[in-house]
């Protein structure tokens, strides 16, 4: 028996009575011991070798097409034949580049849609900030004098704790 399980049996008094709390603890320990034994039995069963049956392979959901050529270049040519009506004359010279362009166009935003007003504003603001940063002008230098004055007044309105303490001591 485990040493922690042996300690569980020491809960009884000399008279042999056990409190309700100790009884719950004993029952819990007993369940833990049974679970531990069951786990050990399962581990032993798992370790013993069993005769295995030959299993038939499960039918997979994916069936590869038989006509797909193994070479990537051949695959590209096959894909280009399927999308040939979309291609222009100069794409026939460089099929891989044209295919790459088609793939990129399919994933990106359509170029026909004009930028919305918000997007234009955002791009314009971003461009302006970048230009100012290149020139070395920060936003603080561009601030209006009213904003700076307002910020200074706000700081003066809220004295620090040290100032408040000194004022209190001075007028006491």
UniProtKB/Swiss-Prot annotation:
Q: Which GO terms describe its cellular component?
A: nucleus
Q: Which domain of life is it from?
A: Eukaryota
What GO biological process terms does the UniProt entry carry, in alphabetical order? chromatin organization
> What Gene Ontology molecular function terms does this protein carry?
chromatin binding
- Found in which tissues? Very high expression in prostate and prostate cancer. Faint expression in other tissues.
Q: Where is this region: Disordered?
A: 40-61
The name this protein carries in UniProt is Putative Dresden prostate carcinoma protein 2
The species this protein belongs to is: Homo sapiens
**Which lineage ranks, top first, belong to the organism behind this chain?**
Eukaryota, Metazoa, Chordata, Craniata, Vertebrata
């Amino acid at each position: 028996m485990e040493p922690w399980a042996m300690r569980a049996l020491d809960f009884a008094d000399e008279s042999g009575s056990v409190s309700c709390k100790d009884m719950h603890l004993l029952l819990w320990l007993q369940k833990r011991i049974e679970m531990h034994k069951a786990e050990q039995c399962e581990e032993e069963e798992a370790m013993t070798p069993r005769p295995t049956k030959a299993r038939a392979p499960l039918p997979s959901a994916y069936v590869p097409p038989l006509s797909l050529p193994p070479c990537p270049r051949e695959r590209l040519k096959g894909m280009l034949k399927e999308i040939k009506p979309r291609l222009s004359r100069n794409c026939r010279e460089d099929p891989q580049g044209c295919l790459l362009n088609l793939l990129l166009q399919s994933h990106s935003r359509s170029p026909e849609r004009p930028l919305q007003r918000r997007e234009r504003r955002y791009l314009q603001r971003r461009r302006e900030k970048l230009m100012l940063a290149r020139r070395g002008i920060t936003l603080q230098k561009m601030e209006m004098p009213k904003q700076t004055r307002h910020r200074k007044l706000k700081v003066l309105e809220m004295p620090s704790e040290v100032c408040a303490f000194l004022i209190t001591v001075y007028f006491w």
